[in-house]
């Protein structure tokens, strides 16, 4: 699904789509949305690339509140242990994970584990 060329240009394109207010979604957002639905392991890899290459804390928030939240809501039991392990040793990932809300869409056990792995101000979005 994602070749080396995409891995190189994907983060730049994705952050470029999410930077405007409101965001202007294009191929990178769509690619990740499809991956979350159909190829969650590929989506996980792309999310980790985004966390690594996020240019600032706001961008980490976009990743957390967007694709990471969607992945954990749709496939949380598969990915929560991976998220816990990475959050334990990676401050950037932990900060990104702290931006995930999703309590009304996520399995309660997954949500509790996520909150323990990355405490942060959470609530329901208006």
Where are these regions (language model features)?
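Alpha-helical solenoid scaffolds in large eukaryotic transport, assembly, and signaling factors
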Residues: 2-115
């Amino acid at each position: 699904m994602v070749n080396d060329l995409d891995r190189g240009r994907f983060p730049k394109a994705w952050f470029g789509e999410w930077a405007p207010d409101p965001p202007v979604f294009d191929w990178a957002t769509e690619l990740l949305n499809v991956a979350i639905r159909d190829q969650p392991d590929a989506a996980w890899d792309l999310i980790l690339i985004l966390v690594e290459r996020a240019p600032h804390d706001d961008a980490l928030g976009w990743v957390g509140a967007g694709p990471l939240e969607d992945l954990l809501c749709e496939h949380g039991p598969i990915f929560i242990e991976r998220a816990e392990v990475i959050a334990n040793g990676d401050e950037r990932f932990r900060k990104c994970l702290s931006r995930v809300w999703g309590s009304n869409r996520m399995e309660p056990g997954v949500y509790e584990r996520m909150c323990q792995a990355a405490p942060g101000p959470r609530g329901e979005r208006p």
